[in-house]
């Protein structure tokens, strides 16, 4: 009678224009030709359409619905006609595209079950008269193409006995592209219609694809989703579905900035061996993201992997130079992302490059083998010299600096046993005249992973992560002194929330060489054994981490430690601090001192990051926290465990009372 369209909930019959609008009469009948009185249909003579719902108007058969209509036309041209027509529409859900598109670098693909060519009465339809039409996009900008036209605009169709697969290039007609940084998201609305004389069967579908690298640090993998009209409904990892409201409890945090950023804790990630990585690679298998996109549910499945770590060692050349230097070059585009050449440094020193060309993205170093923090070791027949280059990534936001924001590269060179031997004539100079003027006192304050005090934390490992009430092992030592007759006398140690030792507020941990008696978690002193040359030049103790409070509010979780000390003559102690016996009245000892000593203050090379015991960072990374927890300043973490307010108040009062000056003497 015209064109039949099978939609999701109804059948639409469009009658040809030669049927008069005033003479058209149509009704729905059962297979015996009896009108179905309980069927509610809509006949529009003006538009020459008949809309019939499946419910109560069709008969369910295998694979779909069957409907019969009777058309009566009383026009003079056709005289009186009464014709019955029968239609078949497949079940909608068996013909839908797959809900998740398969995504690759260049295209997305969808599949749905193969559609039989016998639509309606197979005896009346010639298979050669059937064809496919593709509608790409929706709204005013939608384009309807024949299958051949679609193939020329980025579409491909593969039909086998089981299913039809449609592949679409990401730059094809109807594909919408969204970008945020290096992350890309593509969406597509597609309606594939099977058209035959008098019948049209549409199969609408939406698809979404997400691509681009993830970023990883010491604690999390971060996936960026560009901003687009869809709304995230759930995340599924290996068929374990997690709703948005449950994400935080499952180790996934959501950050809504220019789209979405999903931060997956390392407890969610898996590890696998990878030939392209030095160490095991972190990844998520079958990560399914489900969105609500314009009242439709769409999903995409990806398998994100953390990028490999930077190479641990790069040999700069076979041999060190004959004049005792190591030469190497660093290019800004040597890594992805590129390096910020202004942040390059060698080891912990301030050695500068000998050549720098910003236009070429090149920096050249020439570092001495006996300076700039260069180390050496012996392996077989070689003496290997090595140093470490540090740099930040280019265009790194200031709030995102963390341990994983830094590029590290070890450079090496070596001498072999067969290298040329140099003859040197060394003349001994007369010893210098002894100076009786005391030199400046230099102190070092360091922290160690444990009470063995074997290897201190390196400068580049700060901030160091510690949890509340976990001990911090510290050591104060005298530098550049070999006199066995002197000893180090500890004065005060305290903590501040900024780098300035004189900043307020401050919290005392050692006072007058003894533990601070008003502290709930008092400092413990450790004996210095014979493992060092001059044990009297050292002071070792541990501090229990605590939450610093000021004016009843928790301070920043980044804490800076400082200590002051002086040198004593072991045989002629001339200061009360030189003969401290703890516990005792330290205030009285200081008040009775007749001499003033010059005290010297030393600070830790960097801050300590204090985390609450329940922090999600715990258990991630090295078991001794010999490293950083990542993204330190991207999210300020407030210390949670509160010390009694009276501790901060009394500590502040103590600071005001401690106005004094001491002079250094030996």
UniProtKB/Swiss-Prot annotation:
Cleavage (site feature) positions: 120-121, 588-589
PTM annotation: Proteolytically cleaved before the transmembrane segment to yield the secreted ectodomain incorporated in the zona pellucida. Proteolytically cleaved in the N-terminal part by the metalloendopeptidase ASTL exocytosed from cortical granules after fertilization, yielding a N-terminal peptide of about 30 kDa which remains covalently attached to the C-terminal peptide via disulfide bond(s). This cleavage may play an important role in the post-fertilization block to polyspermy. Additional proteolytically cleavage of the N-terminal peptide of 30 kDa occurs in one-cell and two-cell embryos.
Gene Ontology molecular-function annotations: acrosin binding; structural constituent of egg coat
Domain ZP: residue ranges: 319-585
Gene3D superfamilies documented for this protein: Zona pellucida, ZP-C domain, Zona pellucida, ZP-N domain
Chief site of localization: membrane
Keywords: Cell membrane, Cleavage on pair of basic residues, Disulfide bond, Extracellular matrix, Fertilization, Glycoprotein, Membrane, Receptor, Secreted, Transmembrane, Transmembrane helix
Gene Ontology CC terms, in alphabetical order: collagen-containing extracellular matrix; egg coat; endoplasmic reticulum; extracellular region; multivesicular body; plasma membrane
Cytoplasmic topology ranges: 657-666
Tissue expression as described in the entry: Oocytes (at protein level).
Disulfide bridge partners, by residue number: 6-89, 39-57, 320-413, 351-372, 493-563, 514-582, 568-578
Keyword check for Cytoplasm: no
GO terms under biological process: binding of sperm to zona pellucida; prevention of polyspermy
Region Disordered, annotated ranges: 417-439
Pfam families, alphabetized: Ig_ZP2, Ig_ZP2_3rd, Ig_ZP2_N, Zona_pellucida, ZP-N
Domain writeup: The ZP domain is involved in the polymerization of the ZP proteins to form the zona pellucida.
Protein function: Component of the zona pellucida, an extracellular matrix surrounding oocytes which mediates sperm binding, induction of the acrosome reaction and prevents post-fertilization polyspermy. The zona pellucida is composed of 3 to 4 glycoproteins, ZP1, ZP2, ZP3, and ZP4. ZP2 may act as a secondary sperm receptor.
Family the UniProt entry places it in: Belongs to the ZP domain family. ZPA subfamily.
Protein name as annotated: Zona pellucida sperm-binding protein 2
Gene encoding the protein: ZP2
